[in-house]
Regions:
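C-terminal domain-boundary segment and adjacent tail
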Residues: 2, 10-13, 44, 48-49, ...
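Catalytic domains of cell-wall/extracellular-matrix polysaccharide-remodeling enzymes
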Residues: 113-185, 225, 230
């Protein structure tokens, strides 16, 4: 499978894009991830960005069977991106707002929210080495729960290996830190009340975001287990594909750069924005 993408529509207008990503990919979650991939293929055979965690909740992902499975996904046309290192955030929140963000918005998994620059640099480097050892190309880094704190942001900007990162609402083109509005449809399935709430919210957000240049669908390992949730995002995926071109995040960034060079469509973003989801 290869992404069939173009920078502009036949009418000469900017192409509208859809980027589908699968978060939290690791040996412990891989069986559930495969179910999500199967559910995506029920709708369409599109390229995904798989967000890989090197040591998910402390469990090393450098396992031959898992690495072979991920290499097969790469060969099938999917992109691999680094997604944190441990995917856990054991640090104590600094205040009530920080507690809400790191313990309620996400269940203690915002690993890169409170790291110092040195800590973040070390984890980014270790993750990059694991990718290199497997011969996996690496263009992007996405912080767990999209929570990228000030120290992690500085570490990311200081390394020249990254082409993009993303928050909950933006795609950030690196190293310049150009920001692109990129609404993300994503589901929370941790509890019974979150599932129907997510379904309603994403239905509304998909309508609001119809005119956006890029729409993202951020899936997680358990998003195929609840039939109502699965059918919700499958319908939204099908609807989006009727007027958007599917591409990996790296391919979108490449196409965006090519177009922005021709048309001067670049905007800068303040580093402060990157500490927010």
């Amino acid at each position: 499978m290869r992404p069939d993408v173009t920078a502009e529509s036949a009418a000469g207008l900017p192409q509208r894009w859809l980027c589908v990503s699968l978060h939290d990919v690791a040996p412990a979650t891989w069986p559930s991830c495969q179910k999500v991939l199967d559910a995506v293929r029920e709708v369409a055979d599109v390229p995904l960005t798989l967000l890989i965690v090197p040591a998910y909740h402390g469990q090393c992902s450098a396992q031959p069977e898992f690495e072979r499975a991920i290499s097969a996904q790469l060969a099938a046309g999917h992109e691999l991106a680094l997604h944190g290192y441990f995917h856990v955030d054991p640090q104590v929140p600094s205040d009530f707002v920080d507690w809400l963000r790191r313990r309620i918005y996400t269940a203690g998994e915002g690993e890169f929210c409170g790291l110092s620059e040195d800590e973040a640099r070390e984890r980014l480097t270790l993750g990059a080495r694991w990718f290199a050892a497997n011969g996996w190309p690496m263009a992007g880094f996405v912080a767990p729960a999209w929570l990228l704190g000030a120290g992690a942001w500085r570490a990311l900007r200081a390394q020249d290996k990254w082409q993009y990162t993303s928050t909950l609402t933006k795609m950030i083109v690196l190293p310049e830190a150009y920001a692109i509005d990129a609404p993300c449809l994503t589901y929370s399935v941790r509890s019974a009340w979150r599932r129907p709430t997510s379904i309603v919210w994403n239905r509304l957000l998909s309508r609001v975001a119809q005119g956006s240049q890029i729409l993202r669908l951020g899936l997680h390992p358990h998003d195929a287990e609840s039939r109502p949730v699965r059918r919700s995002w499958q319908r939204l995926l099908e609807r989006a594909l009727s007027h958007r071109k599917a591409a990996t995040k790296a391919e979108f960034v490449r196409q965006w750069r090519a177009r922005s060079v021709r048309h001067g469509e670049r905007r800068s973003v303040s580093p402060v924005l990157q500490s927010l989801p």
